């Protein structure tokens, strides 16, 4: 709800809102499941709107980090039980956003930056 309230100033379409909410939900879920496998830890989300309707949302954790980002971004790759996790988190984010950037340091955490241009309604 907070994301939708923030984005309302751009007058997004319902499908645009749904796409962004899905991508952000996936990013936050990944943090909860993977960053802190044995404990609870902080997750920070920031959002900014830039000229031209560019929206950038950054989700950051201070968890275990990702040792091989390229491998983690491969569809179907999972660090958990394949029966419990599909390994599609980053693929889902990429399908709904214009750009997904991931930076991570093992033992220090991960930052996922989601970028999407919201075209003005005609």
What are these regions (language model features)?
Residues 1-25:
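Conserved short strand/loop->alpha-helix "switch" segment adjacent to the catalytic nucleotide/phosphoryl-transfer site
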Residues 31-122:
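Conserved beta-strand-loop-beta-strand hairpin that lines the nucleotide-binding pocket
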